[in-house]
């Protein structure tokens, strides 16, 4: 029984290490609390990306916020900044935990600092 328990612990640790190798985990703090009708966005600034590369952004719990799949970018140009809405229920105590991963031809890995240059939270005003 102890051997079986030890095996499960080892598998759990390996799975956690594999997830860390396949994604970048970030916890971002909102600049202030959301007001009525306001929306928080994750602004993802991308650098140089290889052709066919996609950036998947989810909450730490696995809820998909979006997939960034730039097309038509010339070789040597940065991919730009993309805004993904953050659901209000994903914000806990003024923070949001995100997971970013790169998908390319069926393989998943963590993005490099050159691929994802920054991720910031921006609050947009309510639409009137």
Task: Please name every model-derived segment.
Residues 3-19:
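Sec-dependent N-terminal signal peptides of Gram-negative exported proteins
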């Amino acid at each position: 029984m102890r051997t079986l328990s030890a095996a499960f612990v080892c598998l759990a640790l390996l799975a956690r290490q594999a997830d860390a190798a396949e994604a970048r985990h970030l916890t971002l703090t909102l600049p202030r609390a959301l007001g009525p009708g306001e929306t928080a966005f994750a602004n993802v600034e991308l650098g140089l990306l290889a052709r066919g590369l996609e950036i998947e952004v989810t909450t730490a719990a696995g809820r998909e916020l979006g997939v960034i799949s730039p097309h038509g970018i010339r070789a040597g140009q940065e991919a730009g900044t993309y805004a993904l809405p953050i659901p209000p229920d994903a914000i806990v105590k003024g923070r949001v935990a995100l997971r970013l991963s790169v998908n390319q031809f069926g393989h998943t890995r963590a993005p490099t600092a050159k691929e994802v240059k920054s991720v910031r939270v921006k609050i947009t005003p309510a639409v009137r």
